[in-house]
Amino acid sequence: MRNETRFKYNAAMAQLAKLNNVEKVSHKFNVAPTVQQKLEDKIQLSSAFLQKINVFLVDEQSGSAVGLGISRPTASRTNTDTNDRQAKDPSNMDERFYFCRKTDFDTAIKYQKLDQWAKFKDFYARFSGQIQKRQGLDRIMIGFNGTSFAATTDIVANPKLQDVNKGWLQKMREENVARVLSSGTAQGKITIGKLGDYKNVDALVMTLVDEMIDEVHQDNPDLVVLCNRKTVADKYFPLVNQDQPNSEKLAADIIISQKRMDNLPVYAVPFFPEDTILVTT
């Protein structure tokens, strides 16, 4: 490490120690709550997708993850000459449980790369930004691919971090099975095409909304489709893989720029499993 790099690196570590009110960061310490919240915010900001989802910090390792929903109407009328007005509780409690497991983010950056960054005035921002970005990407990868939690993980056998923790899709499979469509005419798979269960992916998304989502939420303007980029390409590739007059090409470009499935906005998310679709808000 060059002397200039060492100077900037030491200054960065001193600043990190000051933020956490410790003498040195070379010793184990608990991250200060305000720093922890700022770090969480920066991890979310490192990813356009993470900015669109809710993330809650909790104090307890385990507990109830209680979701609040509105399931019944409240509009009514009462003849107060004879009866008192009665308030109604419109909420339904969708109670599930969480258990936080320690996840290590052990990071090493070679001196050569630090030397390259040392010439920039925003050295520390680059240094910490790379780590935050990778942590954000790992969170997304686990969220969509995690199926289990191992005492010692194996990156070779599980390159998509399947054994680090149970992800969002796995939690759906285990805790919300009534809203998971996994089979068509054949057990364990759904086919799309002329002879398939659905003629196209739009019909599949329509079924998911009509049959898997409560009626009160079916017209929610925040509903979106999450899928793999390949799934999006499979739908729109026929539009571009042909000779077209300019007018038709323009129409195709407009359609592709406003990617939708069953009129819902589509987001191709990093690390999302192929042959999987999630309709959510």
Where are these regions (language model features)?
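Short, intrinsically disordered N-terminal pre-domain segments
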Residues: 1-20, 87-88
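Surface-exposed polar/charged interaction patches
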Residues: 15-22, 41-46, 56-59, 171, ...
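Short glycine-rich, low-complexity/disordered patches
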Residues: 22-37, 141-153, 219-223
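Alpha-helical scaffold segments that mediate packing/assembly in large oligomeric complexes
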Residues: 111-207
